[in-house]
């Protein structure tokens, strides 16, 4: 039987998913406490090529509810295929707009875009309290990595994971 906890474990081990951490039981966070068997509301940023593989792998777990899709090239055949498959998800071409307009519905994001975009997307998502799975490399410079590590400490309830396609089941 699939559960939210199994999804988290699988995602962490396979580095192809979103790891969603525990939430504290403080009064401020009661609205974020959810059941163990509830699906993770996921937004996928980058849904073609590698991003599409991540999207489908996460969907195949049965533990992710795909609520939003974002890709700059909505006209590409592989992107069109994924948009048709997840026709109920909101569609965006700009990740900032997606996080602004659909952010209240999103618990986690996957980042499967070209390398130069990993850092700004991950930082914005973390800053908004979203759990993040990002493909390698996390960022382009050591300074960007240091900023990400500082953000991970600052947003300690947000789980951030970097995956490596060569060591992933996706």
Model-found features: residue ranges?
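Short strand-turn motif at the edge of the Rossmann-like AdoMet-binding core
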Residues: 136-138, 162-166
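N-terminal glycine-/serine-/threonine-rich beta1-alpha1-beta2 phosphate-ribose binding loop
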Residues: 1-131, 143-159
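Oxidoreductase and adenylate-handling cofactor-binding alpha/beta cores
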Residues: 168-170
